[in-house]
């Protein structure tokens, strides 16, 4: 059962300008340690890597039905990879609480994430699925 869908399109050039203006302050405030490490390993695509993750956070906040309010913050959402390499999102804090509230009793939530970029755009699509079994 699908319990949430969200998508977001991010302009990589906007992330580049934000990095020029705010640098490390922006990176520390918005991205998790895992996301920062992944972007650092891709210096030629640094801004695009961050833009995809930014779009993923926005898409997930939409799928949760809250946006970034009601206790859901950018720092509560982090792009991680499953052992297969498939991207997903790890939710903490208010985002995890909202996900738990959305998930019907006796079901477990799974966050599907698709990421892509083609300069100057980065795109993310999130589907939150409630699966049988907790």
Swiss-Prot record:
Keyword tags: Cytoplasm, Fatty acid biosynthesis, Fatty acid metabolism, Lipid biosynthesis, Lipid metabolism, Magnesium, Metal-binding, Transferase
Positions that bind Mg(2+): 8, 58
An example Gene Ontology CC term for this record: cytoplasm
Reactions listed under catalytic activity: apo-[ACP] + CoA = holo-[ACP] + adenosine 3',5'-bisphosphate + H(+)
Record Gene3D superfamilies: 4'-phosphopantetheinyl transferase domain
Places the protein is found: Cytoplasm
Main location: cytoplasm
One GO MF term: holo-[acyl-carrier-protein] synthase activity
Cofactor: Mg(2+)
Pfam families: ACPS
EC number in record: 2.7.8.7
Entry annotated with the keyword Ubl conjugation: no
Tagged with keyword Lipid metabolism: yes
Family from the record: Belongs to the P-Pant transferase superfamily. AcpS family.
UniProt cross-references to HAMAP family, sorted A to Z: AcpS
Function, as annotated: Transfers the 4'-phosphopantetheine moiety from coenzyme A to a Ser of acyl-carrier-protein.
Listed name of the protein: Holo-[acyl-carrier-protein] synthase
Native source species: Acidiphilium cryptum (strain JF-5)
Lineage: Bacteria, Pseudomonadati, Pseudomonadota, Alphaproteobacteria, Acetobacterales
